[in-house]
From Swiss-Prot:
The RNAP catalytic core consists of 2 alpha, 1 beta, 1 beta' and 1 omega subunit. When a sigma factor is associated with the core the holoenzyme is formed, which can initiate transcription. Its EC number is 2.7.7.6. It catalyses: RNA(n) + a ribonucleoside 5'-triphosphate = RNA(n+1) + diphosphate. The lineage of its organism: Bacteria, Pseudomonadati, Pseudomonadota, Gammaproteobacteria, Enterobacterales. The keyword Heme does not apply. It is an enzyme of class 2 (transferase). Keywords: DNA-directed RNA polymerase, Nucleotidyltransferase, Transcription, Transferase. This is DNA-directed RNA polymerase subunit beta. DNA-dependent RNA polymerase catalyzes the transcription of DNA into RNA using the four ribonucleoside triphosphates as substrates. It comes from Buchnera aphidicola subsp. Baizongia pistaciae (strain Bp). GO terms for molecular function: DNA binding; DNA-directed RNA polymerase activity; ribonucleoside binding. InterPro entries: DNA-dir_RNA_pol_bsu_ext_1_sf, DNA-dir_RNA_pol_bsu_external_1, DNA-dir_RNA_pol_su2, DNA-dir_RNAP_su2_dom, DNA-dir_RNAP_su2_hyb_sf, RNA_pol_bsu_bac, RNA_pol_bsu_CS, RNA_pol_bsu_protrusion. GO terms for cellular component: DNA-directed RNA polymerase complex. The keyword Lipoprotein does not apply.
């Protein structure tokens, strides 16, 4: 049986899922929170976070070694302001970082080093931004999210150019060693098969140079990379030591005879058969002619034994003279390198031939010249440079991930070694690269998720912090070397600015620190779970090819194949799948059920993409019997990225859930399995743009993910502990905690404050509404209050609309949507938008700006909504152009004419020294002022309104704290009373004692006396805490604000704008079916059914077939059934049918269909619970149809039948205007529709007289500039085609850039003279000037 929480009991979703729920959906924000926790948490091993950064930089030694600064530990202080205060004040929510440092000064006496002095001190090292409980940061008052980055994992990668580089189409292989920190090292073949290396993508050098720099000589190089052929000189012949398989594929250049028998004739190709014969005969040497030796390459240096002169150096081709000389010098054995064209190419040998260097020093010098061109190389400089490139821990680090990937790639057993490279590493990489070129081994797939890892917030912040510390390190080193250390303390060494600057830069302007998308809870959660391939150290849009963006088999269960933006970022920005998480190395992993002896168990194992490749994995929708064994013998499984059929005994793992492969956004689309992928992508993206409506309504057809999203997003209020609701109003909920959940020394009261009408990042409204009632019992984890777009703890992005699929007079042409006036009247899609408008008063050169109600040249009417301080009242309804905050700016002294001087002298008018620069309501905005905030600089006198606001805030704070204290005191007194009663005291006696005296009562039982004493201490502590809180709050409210330089005062006005739905607004369903409202039709004109019920929305049926999103039709049918069942329950309630009948009917609906997952026995519910359930079911029984495991067609039909509706889902409709029946039944049902944040009010505007461009004098474009409509060249052609010469002339002159003409025309209109006189357009003058700038003079002749 399914166990429901008390919130779920209020409204159960009928679940059509067939597969059992093996694994609960993990906390959806864990990727953000865990990563940041790792960063700030103290790590004793020093592998992660701040500790790792400090340990990697400290101790800092002076250049002469006389002193060093050591790191001991760090601690993060408490943030001064809480999240809400930081948002209103425009501050960063952060805590101070204090680090304990030790300065040690040494005394160098002869050889011994003794400690002269030790000083310890705690040093302030800047502020570290903190993450809020919802995984965001408050930076300068705005909520931001740091998106995780998918970047190429450190390690070694073998790749090829796929034959694209060289014209011949030859495939060139390369290897690249990528460290976490340090220089990249590349090895590559050129078209002539020589091997080269590059450092940091600079000029390439032959690979032998790096080998010589590693102290290898030519002999050692050949010895390392080649096998040897050994030839023995006898008196009259040459014998070759035979290794039979090396002859394969060669053409014999001589007869191969053994015991006078010829086995292989000259010119014959040596095959495997010949080699087997040679092996069988156990022949170890064969006789070869001298010619066979000519052209072979010597593997060693051979010297003249008498003169010690070199006869032949290693890597030299042998010729007849060299062979003779070797014989003369009595060499019996000669070694040559073994190469062939098949699988042992002579690459290194040929590369040595083009290498200009001859020893280690010349190789180092060559590397130095390549890295630092133009600088004269010295031996020491060259050695240091090479040493620091790859072998110094300060400059180079593969990291534990890089080392693991590196050693795995080279098949080394040990995966933990140092982070720097060594000789054997470089040799191993070159060997593997040569093997790949020789046809052994495969290249890596760089888009495989085993080669790409996720870098989350914590790691990026740590890297940034380390950069700041490195800057500090340089300064400290210089400071330590200056002497006079006796007077200095660690504090004097450290300047926190570079660290703060690095952190600030990252959180403020990094490409991955983004302004949070806060349209609705889903967009918040998706933004935090986003994974981007862009950003520092990642890809750029321009360079990213098709392969990187494409869906890869390893994305399965890790990255969503559906949710990604349309446009230039497609495939580069992805979303994490529902169950995916990162492992300790940063690779994405996904859970699977383990299979033991052919039976699927509930044991869960997380596998990364690398591990997954070795297993055969069955899909989640595979049929199992009761014991967990597979029903079929052959099952579709995935193995190494391919799907095929496998025997059931071969399978190792099985998927956990059908929604494992998709992201949170896509898992909210019901019947996703019936939608085309492109439309599903649009659907997932558009859900994030839905604006929270005035009253949220749960979807009738959901997927069961709605609750998880709403709860995890943090917009709802969740009970921390169970208990009874003691008090509830619109802004506060108080819960008396259950006894078994109370700690012994506390009052047992939980207070929850609700957010009321605050503004989101996207200007939508955030408002929390309690969804529990007084005296209700709540459990831990229950939803206490709904936030924006949530309904009883479920995500509710839109509204359930009664839709009909039919054409209606062309009003739904091209995806347009026809809606009924009823939708507007019922405020179904009315949304509240909150705009923040700020007025800043600055100190200017001419004097300071002033906020006042005394504004020059403004009538009384315009000032009617302002108070005496010049600031608008709260509650005032304002229109476009109204003054919100009166402000005057000093004007520069202008030269006055004598007449003006005279007037000034007579009337004494001085007010014209200032100009009006008031804050006005933007054009086209109509709203109500809901809040005003005033921030005044320290030392500037506060105006009357500011003092009023301050007083009000203090009153409110005091009231809140007093109420809070009262509640806690009540809790304590209740505990004391129960203790005294338990000790044997009479209740009547107790009631006579005043509360304040209760603590003084003495009881005989020592245990109870101790408990009372403890409670008394708690009471005293509570009082102290209350006074302290009050004092802190008072200080925060009364102190001046920290404003930017030159700013005296900031007034912020918040306007609430109510937007009804209107033609031009964009709406969409959840299946990528979007459209614009074309007309709002009167209710009486809408099509209606035989009961007279009109439809709300008419959609075009032609929008379905070509788009292939059939999910919307199935949703409509299921929605109809759901609503039909709701209507039946509603009728039963109205007819006051017995609760038994209602229980039976709801049970019947729940039992319908093959829903093994949801077995609900309503007999366990009380009558009250059934009644509450039925009331919530009046508008339809909510249904959940999980993705890839949803309702079948037969189940939908059965549900329609139960609701007494036609099983086709089609109904006869009548035309609202004529009353005539439409000629065929129409698909009618309920679809969940969203209103998207693309409102016509934000897009449409009309220009009167506005601003003009400076050079061309043409009107500007765009709403922000109050611009006009562009009349482009195509429009000009159109008028030319019609021969409308005068209209064209008007467009190109007076309506555009004929300055005199347009002024004249304005005057003429005022005078009532409707004539126009076109003049010379300004753009023509610009053209003249441009031609003159080419030294061609053009003069205009006057007629």
């Amino acid at each position: 049986m399914v166990v429901y929480s008390s919130t779920e009991k209020k409204r159960i979703r009928k679940d059509f899922g067939k597969r059992p729920k093996v694994l609960d959906i993990p906390y959806l924000l864990s990727i953000q929170l865990n990563s940041f926790q790792k960063f700030i948490k103290h790590d004793p091993n020093g592998i992660h976070g701040l500790e790792s950064a400090f340990r990697s930089i400290f101790p800092i030694r002076s250049y002469n070694g006389n002193s060093e600064l050591q790191y001991i530990n760090y601690k993060l202080g408490q943030p001064i302001f809480n999240v809400k205060e930081c948002q209103t004040r425009g501050m960063t929510y952060s805590s101070p970082l204090r680090v304990k440092l030790r300065l040690v000064i040494y005394e160098k006496e002869t050889l011994d080093i003794t400690v002269k002095d030790i000083k310890e001190q705690e040093v302030y090292m800047g502020e570290i931004p903190l993450m809020t409980t919802n995984g965001t940061f408050i930076i300068n008052g705005t909520e931001r999210v740091v998106v995780s980055q998918l970047h190429r994992s450190p390690g070694v990668f073998f790749d090829s150019d796929k034959g694209k580089t060289h014209s011949s189409g030859k495939v060139l292989y390369n290897a690249r060693i990528i460290p976490y920190r340090g220089s990249w090292l590349d090895f590559e073949f050129d078209p002539k098969d020589n091997l080269f290396f590059r450092i940091d993508r600079r000029r390439k050098l032959p690979i032998s140079i790096i080998l010589k720099a590693l102290n290898y000589n030519t002999e050692q190089i050949l010895d390392t990379f080649f096998k040897k052929n050994i030839f023995k000189f006898t008196e009259n012949s040459i014998l070759m030591k035979l290794v039979p398989h090396r002859l394969r594929g060669e053409t014999a250049s001589f007869d191969i005879c053994i015991d006078n028998k010829t086995y292989i004739k000259k010119g014959q190709r040596i095959t495997a058969r010949h080699i087997n014969i040679l092996k069988e005969k156990k022949i170890h040497t064969i006789k070869v002619p001298t010619e066979y030796l000519i052209g072979k390459i010597s593997a060693k240096n051979y010297f003249n034994k008498k003169t010690n002169e070199i006869i032949v150096s290693a890597n030299t081709e042998l010729n007849i003279n060299i062979i003779k000389e070797l014989k003369n010098n009595e060499y019996t054995n000669i070694e040559t390198i073994f190469t062939n064209d098949l699988d042992h190419g002579p690459y290194i040998s040929e590369t040595l031939n083009i290498d200009p260097t001859h020893d280690k020093l010349s190789a180092l010098v060559e590397i130095y010249r390549m890295m630092r061109p133009g600088e004269p190389p010295t031996r020491e400089a060259a050695e240091n440079l090479f040493e620091n490139l790859f072998f110094s821990e300060e400059r180079y680090d593969l990291s534990s991930v890089g080392r693991m990937k590196f050693n795995r790639s080279l098949q080394k057993q040990n995966i933990t070694e140092r982070g720097v490279l060594n000789q054997s590493d470089i040799i191993s990489v070159i060997k593997k690269l040569i093997d790949i070129r020789n046809g052994h081994g495969e290249i890596d797939d760089i888009d495989h998720l085993g080669n790409r890892r996720v870098r989350s917030v914590g790691e990026m912040a740590e890297n940034q912090f380390r950069i700041g510390l490195i800057r500090v390190e340089r300064a400290v080193k210089d400071r330590l070397s200056l002497g006079d250390l006796d007077m200095l303390m660690p504090q004097d060494m450290i300047n926190a600015k570079p660290i703060s600057a690095a952190i600030k830069e990252f959180f403020g302007s990094s490409q991955l620190s983004q302004f949070m998308d806060q349209n609705n809870p889903l967009s918040e959660i998706t933004h935090k779970r986003r994974i981007s391939a862009l950003g520092l150290g990642g890809l750029t849009r321009e360079r990213a090819g098709f392969e990187v963006r494409d869906v890869h088999p390893t994305h399965y269960g890790r990255v969503c194949p559906i949710e990604t933006p349309e446009g230039p970022n497609i495939g580069l920005i992805n979303s994490l799948s529902v169950y995916a998480q990162t492992n300790s190395y940063g690779f994405l992993e996904t859970p699977y059920r383990k299979i033991h002896n052919g039976k699927v168990t509930n044991e869960i194992k997380y596998l990364s993409a690398i591990e997954e490749g070795n297993f055969i994995i069955a899909q989640a929708n595979t049929n199992l019997d009761e014991t967990g064994a597979f029903v079929e013998d052959l099952i579709t499984c995935r193995y190494k990225g391919e799907s095929s059929l496998f025997n059931k005994n071969q399978i190792n793992y099985m998927d956990v859930s059908t929604q494992q492969i998709v992201s949170v956004g896509a898992s909210l689309i019901p019947f996703l399995e019936h939608d085309d992928a492109n439309r599903a992508l649009m659907g997932a993206n558009m859900q994030r743009q839905a604006v929270p409506t005035l009253r949220s309504e749960k979807p009738l057809v959901g997927t069961g993910m709605e609750r998880a999203v709403a709860v995890d997003s943090g917009v709802t209020i969740i009970a921390k502990r169970g208990g009874i609701v003691q008090y509830v109003d619109a802004s506060r909920i108080i819960i008396k905690v259950k006894k078994n959940e109370i700690n012994s020394e506390e009052a047992g009261i939980d207070i929850y404050n609700l957010k009321k009408y605050t503004r989101s990042n996207q200007n939508t409204c955030i408002n929390q509404i309690p969804c529990i009632s007084l005296g209700e019992n709540v459990e831990k984890g229950n939803v206490l209050a709904d936030g924006p777009s949530t309904d009883l703890g479920e995500l509710a992005l839109g509204q359930n609309m009664r839709v009909a699929f039919m054409p209606w007079n062309g009003y739904n042409f091209e995806d347009s949507i026809l809606i009924s006036e009823k939708v507007v009247q019922e405020d179904r899609f009315t949304t509240i938008h909150i705009q923040e408008l700020a007025c800043i008063s600055r100190d200017t050169k001419l004097g300071s700006e002033e906020i006042t109600s005394d504004i020059p040249n403004v009538g009384e009417a315009a000032l009617s909504k302002l108070d005496e301080s010049g600031i608008v009242y709260i509650g005032a309804e304002v229109n476009g152009g109204d003054i919100l905050v009166g402000k005057v700016t000093p004007k520069g002294e202008t030269q006055l004419t004598p007449e003006e001087k005279l007037l000034r002298a007579i009337f004494g008018e001085k007010a014209s020294d200032v100009k009006d620069s008031s804050l006005r309501v933007p054009n086209g905005v109509l709203g109500t002022v809901i809040d005003v905030q005033i921030f005044t600089r320290d030392g500037v006198k506060k105006d009357k309104r500011a003092l009023e606001i301050e007083e009000m805030q203090l009153k409110q704070a005091k009231k809140d704290l007093t109420e809070e204290q009262k509640v806690f005191e009540l809790g304590l007194f209740t505990q004391i009373k129960s203790t005294l009663i338990n000790s044997g005291m009479n209740i009547d006696q107790l009631n006579k004692i005043p509360k304040s005296e209760l603590f003084k009562v003495k009881v005989t039982n020592n245990l109870y006396q101790k408990k009372i004493h403890k409670l008394f201490l708690k009471y005293e502590e509570l009082k102290k805490c209350f006074n302290k809180k009050l004092e802190t709050t008072r200080n925060k409210i009364t102190q001046g604000d920290d404003l930017a330089p030159g700013v005296l005062k900031i007034v912020k006005v918040y306007l609430a704008v109510k937007r009804h739905i209107q033609p031009g607004d964009k709406m969409a369903g959840r299946h990528g079916n979007k459209g614009v409202i074309s007309k709002i039709n009167p209710i009486e004109d809408m099509p209606y059914d035989q009961n007279g019920l009109p439809v709300d929305v008419v959609l075009n049926p032609l929008g379905v077939p070509s788009r292939m999103n059939i999910g919307q039709i199935l949703e409509t049918h299921l929605g109809l059934a759901s609503k039909g069942l709701g209507n039946i329950i509603d009728t039963m309630l109205k007819q006051q049918k017995s609760i038994l009948n209602i229980r039976k009917f709801i049970q019947k609906a729940f039992n319908l269909g093959n829903n093994t997952r949801q077995k609900t026995n309503l007999n366990n519910f009380s009558d009250d619970e059934i009644l509450s359930l039925a009331k919530n079911f009046k508008n339809g029984i909510p249904i959940s149809t999980p993705v890839f495991d949803g309702a079948q067609e037969s189940e939908i039909k059965a549900l329609l039948k139960l609701a007494d509706l036609p099983s086709s889902g089609q109904i006869t409709l009548f035309d609202g205007r004529t009353g005539e029946k439409f000629e065929r039944p129409v698909t009618v049902g309920y679809m969940y529709m969203l209103k998207l944040n693309h409102l016509v009010d934000d897009k449409m505007h009309a220009r009167s007289t506005g601003s003009y461009s400076l050079v061309t004098q043409q009107p500007l474009g765009g709403k922000a500039q109050f611009g006009g409509q562009r009349f482009g060249e195509m429009e000009v052609w159109a008028l030319e085609a019609y021969g409308a010469a005068y209209t064209l002339q008007e467009m190109l002159t007076v309506k555009s850039d004929d300055v005199n003409g347009r002024t004249k025309m304005y005057k003429n209109i005022v005078d009532g003279n409707y004539k126009m006189e076109p003049g010379m357009p300004e753009s023509f003058n610009v053209l003249l000037k441009e031609i003159r700038s080419l030294a061609i003079n053009i003069e205009l002749e006057n007629e």
